[in-house]
């Protein structure tokens, strides 16, 4: 993302002020929920709850990989469809991108019965046509993380290789693309009619929209940003990995929706981005993200029954190690994700 001019204010405080809403006292919600929850939303910077839904439970889930970023809120639509929500960076955004407990996050959602995840993330734009406040539905990923983040549930003594040629779920991507009208649904359209939601089909001539995932927490140098553009990068963030890889291993359909806040540092013709600009874009993105999420939850409830089914059982046959050679403690650990796959 681009360079910031602070103008004497604290960025994190302004961001929190910009996304503040009157909230239900979640602490008073029940700490248990009976029944499966098939859809989850993971919120990124600027999206810390789903205000259009009705919270019914707040869960603290311990996994074989520790605790997730925070409590998971179960909410229902007006029709009664349940959705799990988890704030990736914690309720107070106190987790660095490299410190997000992604394995615990995905494992906890899997434990709830989640079959599909719609994840939101703020991004910097690497292309002129992807403007601040635009939304992007990426189809490919380039990994520029540094190996700091655990990116697999498997480990020495229990080896598996998940397919990742299509890092986002094609059926979930299509459901999202088909659900959002090309015009008029979200605020922020240009006068020339360019859609706010950039998809492979409607804005990129059928070419992939590629997200670069960098380690952070520092932003890119200008040279790095130009390199990513030369690779065909569309947007850049610090969050899509290992989240997408772990979702694939957990046999959960996954799609990220990116919310552009600014141009990355490649664009010298742009004025340095001020805090006020970023906060304004975050606020607009947050409102649009909530509207988009509400629409997609209804679409998933109506049409998403088959999404994720083609992934079920895939990891059972992705294991290279003979189960007879795996230590019992490793099998017990993986039983959290895959009960019944391997005899303990």
Swiss-Prot record:
Substrate binds at residues 238, 262-264. It catalyses: S-methyl-5'-thioadenosine + phosphate = 5-(methylsulfanyl)-alpha-D-ribose 1-phosphate + adenine. Disulfide bonds: none annotated. Keywords: Cytoplasm, Glycosyltransferase, Nucleus, Purine salvage, Transferase. It holds the Pfam family PNP_UDP_1. Its EC number is 2.4.2.28. GO terms for biological process: L-methionine salvage from methylthioadenosine; purine ribonucleoside salvage. It is found in: Cytoplasm; Nucleus. Phosphate binds at residues 45, 88-89, 121-122, 239. InterPro entries: MTAP (IPR010044), Nucleoside_phosphorylase_d (IPR000845), Nucleoside_phosphorylase_sf (IPR035994), Purine_phosphorylase-2_CS (IPR018099). Gene3D superfamilies: Nucleoside phosphorylase domain. One of its GO terms (cellular component) is cytosol. One of its GO terms (molecular function) is S-methyl-5-thioadenosine phosphorylase activity. Pathway: Amino-acid biosynthesis; L-methionine biosynthesis via salvage pathway; S-methyl-5-thio-alpha-D-ribose 1-phosphate from S-methyl-5'-thioadenosine (phosphorylase route): step 1/1. The record marks 220, 275 as: Important for substrate specificity. Homotrimer. Catalyzes the reversible phosphorylation of S-methyl-5'-thioadenosine (MTA) to adenine and 5-methylthioribose-1-phosphate. Involved in the breakdown of MTA, a major by-product of polyamine biosynthesis. Responsible for the first step in the methionine salvage pathway after MTA has been generated from S-adenosylmethionine. Has broad substrate specificity with 6-aminopurine nucleosides as preferred substrates. Belongs to the PNP/MTAP phosphorylase family. MTAP subfamily. NCBIfam families: MTAP. PANTHER family: S-METHYL-5'-THIOADENOSINE PHOSPHORYLASE (PTHR42679:SF2). This is S-methyl-5'-thioadenosine phosphorylase. The gene is MEU1.
